[in-house]
A protein has these predicted regions:
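Blade-level signature of beta-propeller repeat domains, shared across WD40, Kelch, NHL, RCC1
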Residues: 618-649
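N-terminal secretory signal peptides and thylakoid transit peptides that target proteins
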Residues: 1-14
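Residue-level signature of beta-propeller blades and closely related beta-rich strand-turn architectures
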Residues: 67, 111, 153, 196, ...
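Beta-strand-rich domains and repeat architectures in extracellular enzymes and scaffolds
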Residues: 42-71, 94-96
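A short helix->beta-strand "capping" segment at the edge of beta-propeller domains
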Residues: 30-47
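Short, conserved, GDST-rich strand-edge loop motifs in beta-rich repeat architectures
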Residues: 450-456, 497-512
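Surface loop/turn motifs at the tips and blade-to-blade linkers of beta-strand repeat domains
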Residues: 42-47, 87-91, 128-132, 171-175, ...
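Repeated scaffold domains used in trafficking and secretory/extracellular systems
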Residues: 48-53, 93-99, 134-140, 177-183, ...
Length: 649
């Protein structure tokens, strides 16, 4: 097994190396009194090479990327130990699904959902189909060469016939469920793993008849999110108890539920049945397991990369390959060795990704992305990679410590300048997975982190961390049937802005976002109301002077709220949608991703100080960071980090 530190440092150093050539930040930090709105380009915000899936054809591993523009499939030739070519996939924000038919590799994208064929002999890429559903999550080919796709919103199964170039809609295996997350196909059936409420459905390929295979004893599980198949067995990874379901295809009543043994294991993320064994990977631990079908013995083979997500497990010439972000682990059953192959070091494309968060501690700027954050040193222009197995969604600096809220697991990490790794403080649990904001209350000394629940689950949560006591406490629900999206805190009270969406895929049951107050001493909700009619989200909150709170809504409106009277006193339409908002004295700054606006809080008027950003934020959620000097903002133009000079008054 490769030690965790070596894995993190190797992956981080390799990705960051691609960014060292751009060093414009040095001059930017020392410039004096630049006119407000002056932009300084600091180069790519976050450079990464995250993988989403892979497939073998002969001695070549074809690996697909996520979050690049365009995304690519890189051909890693095992014999040459290098990535010899890339195939551009021009649409979609990522590649989650791949399969092969003969020597052709099929690639499924998401947002938008297109199907591509890579002719590996001719070296040609052809778009062969498109689908109305939001995501293509999973694909598998049948023995007779048809391609089956599982999609989401709604959870649907499609069949693509390469011989005719036509697609057939096989419908929703479990009507009302939003996700088909895993799929396999044999001569007779297509097997679909469903979420957010678990189902395992067999669909007759000829008649379309559907049959539930999931045993009643596990019908209360959340997902069948990964699947492997042999001639005789199916194996499905179930959430959220870290369980593997193994059943006989001919007699589904004969089944076993295998519990992953790593502490806190919740998800089985990839499954392969090969040579009498079920190989599978878990999260959050990143542990790699093997279950023997004949003896029912479970083995822990190692932790190839601590906490990493394994997207796919493949067998090739006697070895087992696991596809992870920018890397592949290789297990040799004959020797028990577990090796690590960094594809970026072997030529896989590293490129600017869609950033997820931005934050400045005054000396450096953190930009969160897949698998960690790029850290831009403002004095030297040097960029380093802080590797974390997850996605930093929100950051906050208190003293000499920067806190990071990490998806998945709704985890809180801490990073101190000069350290090569961030330290895990806690995972939220409580069916939460997506941190939304961070705030610090000086009165109580608490770090406050709101989170969104896992797909299909109700009620977001609010977690409180005390650095002094080392305690981490979670409260759920806080605002009933909503997610807390934004937070600020002062004098022992946290002010909360909500999002009507609970877990993804779960239809909202409320119509309007709320503003609420939560007492950090008594841990009670004090009040809640709806500040902007019809707003889906309160994207950001900021405290002003004299008991005034400001917020930005998904409608692009900024509102002023009197905390004493608990009334909205003024509103102004600023942007096209909600983004970050900061108050500096008698002015505020906010963004909708396209422009940065300055608001005069006395006259309550606004003007754009920067236009044309066209920030390519992951998920379309625009972010903004305020330098502690209050003389600069950090934003994203396209996929580059930019410094914006401001007057701060």
């Amino acid at each position: 097994m490769i030690p965790r530190r070596r894995f993190l440092q190797a992956a981080a150093a390799t990705t960051a190396a691609a960014t060292f050539t751009t060093t414009p930040a040095r001059a930017a930090t020392h410039q004096k009194a630049q006119p407000e709105g002056t932009l300084t380009d600091l180069g790519p915000a976050s450079v990464a090479s995250p993988l989403g899936n892979g497939e073998f054809v002969g001695g070549v591993l074809y690996a697909g990327s996520r979050g690049l523009s365009p995304n690519v499939v890189g051909a890693f030739d095992l014999g040459q130990d290098s990535v010899t070519t890339h195939f551009d996939i021009p649409t979609g924000v990522g590649i989650w699904a791949m399969c092969k038919v003969g020597t052709d590799v099929y690639v499924g994208t998401h947002a938008r959902s297109d199907l591509y064929k890579i002719d590996t002999i001719a070296g040609q890429v052809t778009k062969v189909a498109e689908y109305p559903d939001h995501y293509i999550w999973t694909m598998a080919s049948s023995p007779d060469g048809k391609v089956y796709l599982g999609t989401s919103e709604p959870g649907r199964v499609w069949e693509y016939d390469p011989a005719t170039g036509t697609s057939r809609d096989l419908g929703q295996p479990a009507p009302g469920e939003a996700y088909v997350r895993s799929i396999q196909a044999d001569d007779t059936y297509v097997y679909a793993g469903i979420g957010a409420n678990a189902h395992l459905i067999a669909i007759d390929r000829r008649t379309g008849e559907k049959r539930e295979l999931l045993p009643a004893a596990v019908a209360d599980r959340d997902w069948v999110s990964s699947m492997g198949m042999s001639e005789t067995h199916l194996a499905g990874g179930m959430n959220s108890l870290g369980e593997l379901l193994v059943l006989e295809k001919a007699a589904p009543q004969n089944y076993k539920v295998v519990k992953a043994t790593a502490a806190g294991e919740k998800y089985i993320v990839a499954v392969l049945i090969h040579d009498g064994y079920v190989y599978f990977a878990g999260r959050p631990s990143g542990t790699f397991y093997r279950y023997h079908l004949a003896t029912e013995k479970l083995e822990v083979l190692g932790v190839p990369y601590f906490e990493a997500l394994t997207h796919r497990i493949l067998a090739h010439e006697g070895r087992i390959y696991g596809i992870q972000d920018s890397a592949v682990f290789v297990y040799d059953p004959a020797t028990g060795s577990l090796d690590y192959v960094n594809l970026v070091q072997r030529g896989f494309k590293a490129a600017p990704e869609e950033p997820m968060s931005v934050h400045s501690d005054g000396r450096r700027v953190y930009v969160g992305g897949k698998g960690g954050a790029d850290v831009h040193d403002l004095a030297t222009g040097k960029v380093t990679r802080l590797g974390i197995s997850g996605e930093p969604k929100t950051l906050l600096t208190v003293g000499d410590t920067t806190y990071l809220g990490i998806y998945t697991q709704a985890a809180l990490y801490a990073h101190r300048p000069g350290k090569t790794e961030a330290d895990l403080i806690a995972r939220t649990g409580n069916q939460q997975d997506r941190p939304r904001d961070l705030a610090y209350d000086a009165t109580t000394g608490l770090i406050v982190m709101p989170t969104q629940p896992e797909p299909g689950h109700m009620n977001g949560a609010l977690s409180l961390y005390s650095p002094r006591k080392g305690t981490y406490e979670t409260y759920r629900p806080v605002v009933e049937r909503q997610t807390v999206y934004s937070v600020v805190a002062r004098h022992g009270v946290a002010y909360l802005g909500t999002l009507i969406q609970e877990g993804l895929g779960l239809p909202p049951v409320t119509t309007t976002a709320r503003l609420a107050a939560f007492d950090l001493r008594t841990r009670k909700l004090l009040w809640q109301l709806e500040p902007i009619p019809g707003a889906r989200m309160i994207s950001s909150l900021a405290l002003g002077r004299n008991g005034t709170l400001y917020g930005m809504a998904s409608t692009g409106e900024v509102f002023e709220f009197d905390l004493r009277s608990r009334k909205v006193t003024r509103t102004i339409k600023v942007g096209t949608k909600g983004g970050e908002l900061f108050v500096t004295g008698r002015v505020a700054y906010c963004t909708d991703g396209g422009s940065i606006y300055k608001i005069d809080l006395v006259a309550f008027t606004s003007k754009a100080i920067v236009d044309g950003l066209a920030g390519q934020w992951f998920g379309g959620e625009p972010k903004l960071a305020l330098d502690p000097s209050r003389r600069a903002l950090y934003a994203v133009r396209a996929r580059n980090l930019v410094r914006v000079a401001i007057a701060g008054r």
